[in-house]
A protein has these predicted regions:
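Short N-terminal targeting/anchoring amphipathic segment
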Residues: 89-110, 123-130
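Carbohydrate-associated surface elements
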Residues: 181-184, 202
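Nucleotide-activated donor-binding/catalytic signature segment of Leloir-type glycosyltransferases, i.e.
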Residues: 254-256, 261, 267-295
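A charged, aromatic-enriched C-terminal amphipathic alpha-helix characteristic of glycosyltransferases
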Residues: 357-362, 374-404
Length: 407
């Protein structure tokens, strides 16, 4: 008989809809594991799946700012969202029937719910931390502004961070096992809970595989959110394109940068591009559905990953899913600027592409693959040991940890 897993996670919001959980549930051995997923419902997002039972709890009833602020404060002070989720779970399923509880989050919610259910029903608890507050170092990283005054915002956010870290650690300490997504995260969290395991983000090998698709233009492609241009910094690429254009080595009818970013930072990025006077090389698009991403990446000549150098002030251990999807299709990866840390190391070890530190490197990289595209109509790189990053392999690692905890 299959063992039942009660999975708690943060909301399924676009454009990715928590791919780590989706892929885990899809790739678990159905004869051994039966996942049931509980999360928060996102307003105006009608996400559902037939892969596993999915229960979504409405918490925010509308996008009204007053309503949102009230519910946010209520949750900050009393963790009301976790309280409501526990009631929602107990009203929709029998927790006694599950063999273990698994909670995956990028922040705090729903860790407290997971801990309380684990304690109440005496169930083993495994925590998957996809992001942690400390990875941002001294940077402030919140998506909502409470005040129009920056210093007041920063003060409030720092107090919230301290409270959230305290609440998070209360659960981490009690967990039977922890999983996380980068060597930096592993080393940091292991100091709190020694039974911590590294499981990178990855790619679905069933849909992200190489195809030799010829294209009429040499496309440098970026997909996903672009929240902060200081954190995800494209300057090395823009300067390289500017110089190559001035040197008459590329033209906008042959080379394009395609930004699939929706409206996130579109205006700010457009203004930055204008400073380099290379508007004709750039095209903007809305987010694309997940099922179209593999084909898009395969059509690309270079897949772009934006980050910045890791300093003693952060950020640390940022390993975007987009990188792993790019190596799945075996297209050249251009990472600008190199983090000179975890991501750069994996790029080097896998021969996936370039983690750039200067403009000349970027120019040389673009020209090399541009020449390959001119010869063949497509580009390709031989990625080393990419199978270790497949979602299928990750599911096997998760299953091993589940079994160890249940022994």
């Amino acid at each position: 008989m299959a063992k039942k897993i009660l999975i708690l996670t943060d909301p399924f919001d676009p454009p990715l809809f928590v791919p780590r959980i989706n892929n885990l549930c899809k790739n678990l051995d159905k004869n051994k594991w039966e996942p049931h997923v509980f999360t928060e419902k996102v307003i105006d997002v009608n996400y559902n799946t037939t892969l596993y039972p999915l229960y979504q709890m409405p918490y925010y009833k509308s996008k009204n700012k007053l309503h949102w602020t009230y519910k946010w404060i209520l949750n900050l002070l009393f963790q009301n969202k976790d309280i409501q989720l526990q009631k929602f779970i107990e009203n929709n399923t029998n927790v006694e029937d599950y063999d273990l509880i698994f909670c995956s989050t990028f922040n705090l919610f729903p860790l407290t719910t997971a801990r309380k259910l684990s304690t109440k029903y005496n169930k083993p608890l495994i925590i998957d931390l996809r992001d942690i507050t400390e990875q941002w170092g001294k940077q402030v990283y919140f998506s909502h502004k409470i005040s129009k005054f920056t210093k007041l915002n920063n003060f409030i956010y720092k107090q919230v961070e301290k409270l959230n870290i305290k609440r998070r650690n209360k659960t981490i300490i009690k967990a039977n096992a922890i999983t996380t997504i980068s060597p930096w995260h592993h080393n940091f969290i292991q100091k709190i809970n020694p039974n911590t395991h590294l499981i990178y983000n990855g790619y679905d090998a069933n849909i992200f595989f190489p195809q030799q698709i010829k294209s009429n233009t040499f496309d440098i492609t970026y997909t996903g959110r672009l929240i902060d241009l200081n954190f995800r910094n494209p300057n090395l690429l823009l300067e390289a394109i500017q110089q190559l254009h001035k040197e008459n080595k590329i033209t906008p009818d042959k080379v394009t940068i395609k930004w699939y970013i929706g409206n996130t930072q579109k205006d700010e990025l457009s203004n930055l591009i204008k400073q380099y006077n290379i508007e004709s090389y750039n095209n903007f698009f809305d987010f694309i559905p997940n099922n179209e991403i593999p084909n898009l990446l395969n059509k690309s000549s270079i897949n772009l990953i934006l980050t910045n150098k890791t300093t003693k002030e952060g950020p640390f251990g940022i390993m975007t899913t987009k990188f792993f999807e790019a190596i799945g299709v075996e297209k050249p990866v251009l990472c600008v600027r190199s983090d000179e840390d975890c991501l750069a190391q994996v790029i080097k070890e896998t021969n996936a592409g370039l983690a750039a530190t200067n403009v000349e490197e970027v120019k040389e990289f673009i020209l090399y693959h541009y020449n390959q595209w001119q010869k063949h109509g497509y580009t390709h790189v031989d990625v080393k040991n990419k199978e270790q990053f497949s979602r299928q392999n990750q599911a096997l690692i998760f299953e091993k940890i589940f079994n160890q905890v249940l022994e």
